[in-house]
Amino acid sequence: MRIVVLTGGIGGARFLLGVRAYAQEVGAEVTAVVNVGDDLRLHGLRVCPDLDSVMYTLGGGADPERGWGRTGETWTVKDELAAYGAEPGWFGLGDKDLATHLVRTTMLDAGYPLHQVTEALATRWQPGVRLLPATNDRLETHVIVSARSELASPAATNNASTVSARSELASPAATNNAAAADGFGGGQQAIHFQEWWVRHRAQLPTHRFVFVGAEAAKPAPGVTEAIAEADVVLIAPSNPAVSITPILAVAGVREAVTTGPAPVVGVSPIIGGAPVRGMADRCLAVVGVECSAAGVGQLYGARAAGGLLDGWLVAEEDAQTVIPQVTVRAAPLRMTDEAATVAMVRAAVEMA
């Protein structure tokens, strides 16, 4: 059996622990296609938060308290940067984590594509699944917010290290909005998703998400091939708006999923009307989707009607969920330990 998982970072990484354990039970192969929309360049280094969260979690090196970064992390470099007044102070890189970014950036600068760099990094961590970035190309999630003077300050935009490329975002192709060609119009501006999420805690007046580079991005080698050869495609219980949608925005990925032979089963990230973790409710509000299992299921839609899903696994609290032309099943979805997560994965695979 071949299993493909479309996934984001922290929640998706925990889900993949269960997928890996299930795969070992049944002798399956697993490929994880990971979101890169959160990626940014910081202090000259390429940082891939979701890829690293998955790699560290599956490799046994993730911090269980924070849910991100490395266990036993230290912050000497962060403190030294702060002493120099280097921005951004709101996004810290731990000393151990920095080693990953240094190796990644060195390899990228030497000409290696991201999927090969990821494979090389994974040789240390032995995640037990194949990790693929959704694309090797530039793809960043930017957020269109109401303009505020503090957002335009050098500190907020990280000086020369900022990843907000307003000239690119200002094009109609990048924003799918002709008004954006003139500085977004109506007092709007773009900031990187990480600034919106980490610094501002998703509290700014927000208009939409833009996946910069998606139209030109190509799937990383192996992505569409894995989907075409899969026996089942699972959509992890990751943030639908900013973890799963950027993957599907890469040209050719959505088509590979919707036209491929494998059944597509999604797992709801919403239990009883609330996110399992994080601020997915705020992201869903930006895209006009109700924070519920039904809302997310309808966002993905039925494959038979041009959407993604053949099956939708929801929590027992949401057993009455109905998605037209999609098989809906309820099961315990709290990933309290590996056994619970394996049972959840098994329930999803059995829907295929």
Describe each PLM feature range:
Residues M1-I3:
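Extreme N-terminal starter segment of soluble prokaryotic enzymes
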Residues G27-A28, G260-V264, L309:
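A short helix->loop->beta-strand "cap" motif at the edges of active sites that frequently abuts
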Residues R277-A352:
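C-terminal functional extensions of proteins
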